[in-house]
Amino acid sequence: MPGYTVLLDNDLFLAAVTKQARPILMDIAHYERALEIRSFGLPKSGRTYYRPRPARGKYVASAPGQAPAIRSGNLFRNEGLPRFVAPLTVERVIDTEYAAYLEDGVPGRLAPRPFIAPAIETVKQRFAAGQLGRF
C-alpha cells in the first residue's frame, strides 16, 4: 500500500490562520465589550441613592447578581479596547481598581455584581451554536 508524508510549514500555516482569525477574534472581543457596557444600562432593582457631586440626582443601585449600575461612569469609561498581545490572543484591560471587586464580590461586604462573566458566557453560547461571522 503506497504511503505519503505531509510536511507542514508551521510559519506559513500560522500566518494563513492568523490572517483569517484576527478579524473574527477582534469582532468577538468588541461584541463582548459591548455586552458588558449594555449590561450597565439595564434596569436595576437595588436601593435608590443620591449621586455624589458634581453629578447630583438619584440613581437605582444594582441588586446582588445584577451588573453594576452607572453611578459615576468611571467603570463604563474605563472599559478598555481589545488589542492583540500575540498572533491569536486578544487582551482587554478594564482600568478601574474596583472592577474585580464588583465582578467577584467581597466576602461579607459586597455581593457579586457580575458583568464580565455573563458577557463571556453569551459569546461562548453564540460560538457553540455556530453563530460566527460578524458579531
PLM regions with names:
Residues 1-135:
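Short, Lys/Arg-rich flexible segments
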